[in-house]
């Protein structure tokens, strides 16, 4: 592959509005469609600095710059529209995190790629509301935080307290939240306020390896590590009172709980197993990609179908996992306030996935088409009146949950028609990353990090050594950096703003 200098690379990238950029064909070999990415001035600098650094002599290894990853996805067989980079985009395995792409189901060459879903399949966010207010929680903040720690297992290697045997796991993988409902871990209405109603019907546990099942069995109902969290949040600002009221968010100071987790080691193993099989399928079917991390298979091949069935099972695992933690969160609150979750009005506002591939109908060149939409670090954002969103949100659009980094605000958005047309009903998912985990461990001081969290009045139990550095403000971006481009700039129309939580 020819290595170009930075100025030559820039000739393939065109600013098309204040906050959006087109990546022209030719930027990377064999591009079938153009790429596009959205960024404000600060994110723009991060993206182009990353590209500039990659052009320096001797800069090899690690992930490619996000801009090049968007372009490499644009070269995959069967892609339609554009390869889209959303405002929290940063480099990842294969696809950049914050990259979405759609593939034509009627095209026999179209592919599915585990790198377009990620290793933490159906990593997602769930938001619960309560009838509590900041004044109720502030005096017992430390005790409530400890109660959550006591109820929800956290960290690498954590084991769940939800009783489950191998037979239960098989049923949970197939049934998703229907299993949780049957076992009494969720309320019936929880399922209605969940993407796909908490169950991928295409799941087939027989396509999942025993190793994946062995890894997943003890982890149900656990938060995990990394950027996962169960966070008590306060409604700080309401932008759209009608949309907020439909979600049960009525007043400033109201307490909500956001749970961010996924399929844990189970999903990671499903992805790992699939990559091995897909490399074989690529050789057999003579599929070539610009990056070996984009290992893939034809959608309708045995390998492609097996992956989609196993991925769906992992997605169901993740919904059961978040449902189990919802149960445990309700128990923690009930214990602290000596009442019931029902009396605390602890209803699920919505649950969204941001690492998944799903078959959806979209308009392409004026005609409806069945597409396999890959969203990696990307949240579904369907508009008002869409048949796949709950009755409660038909007039507002789907709630879109965008979690902030530790110590910064999160946002609740709603999907729009314009976003449906321009980004296949997708938007950003989180704060994004400025430093890798390895760099944060090397460069960020634990005592300094703890000082920041202490000044922000974080409960002492939350100031753990690894978390303090992972969530350091220098390492992670803030939601305001990209929720403003998503919600208010005409060039990034994928969602409209409803409210802000801190």
Swiss-Prot record:
Sites where the protein binds Mn(2+) 2: 123, 260, 354
GO cellular component: nucleus; tRNA-splicing ligase complex
Keyword Electron transport: no
Positions annotated as active site in the UniProt record: 429 (gmp-histidine intermediate)
Gene3D superfamilies: tRNA-splicing ligase RtcB
Record keywords: GTP-binding, Ligase, Manganese, Metal-binding, Nucleotide-binding, tRNA processing
Family classification: Belongs to the RtcB family.
Matching HAMAP family: RtcB_euk
Subunit structure comment from the entry: Catalytic component of the tRNA-splicing ligase complex.
Protein's recorded name: RNA-splicing ligase RtcB homolog 2
Species annotation: Culex quinquefasciatus (Southern house mosquito)
